[in-house]
């Protein structure tokens, strides 16, 4: 089978990362063909993300989801997979069987597409009474045991709380203030952020540029003793949360 995977924006967030894993194992385990489509109309694509996809898959830029019907016949697509909030919108095809992966709580009246699934067991139980099945993210980390402590001049006895995710995903103002108060009182604590928009200046609140490099991301997680999160929207199954969890 030929399966298309549609990504709105090629960025460093969980949707692009998880879609890569689904497309990869769709070929490796299920022996299907994966084709990647992304919306050229979005403004914040990361070149390194597009490059990584192109090393493994055929990648096509389209002018919105509306162009998918054209490629469905041209490339003989059996299905098109897309992650989104879950509400009815224009990201569904009338000609290609569309697989909807819902990330957020929705009413059952929002069901659409050929198949509709939730991203987590919690989402399925809490908001659909298990009427809608769930498929969680594939959580995979590189095996390296190296960390960034020496490079970042973090002392061995310091406790490191870390967070990585979308640039705007650590947006609770009162948490920002709490972190500043904490580092003033505790010199043995530091906070480390990957791809998070900088919200303060302090030598023990460190902000690192985002990366799609799996080795670097694992080094970042290895540097941390625990994850800290401060997203106003919350998560139903955050990929970053899963990555920290399997680290132990």
For each predicted feature, which ranges?
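Conserved catalytic-core segment of nucleotide-activated headgroup transferases in glycan assembly
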Residues: 137-203, 207-214
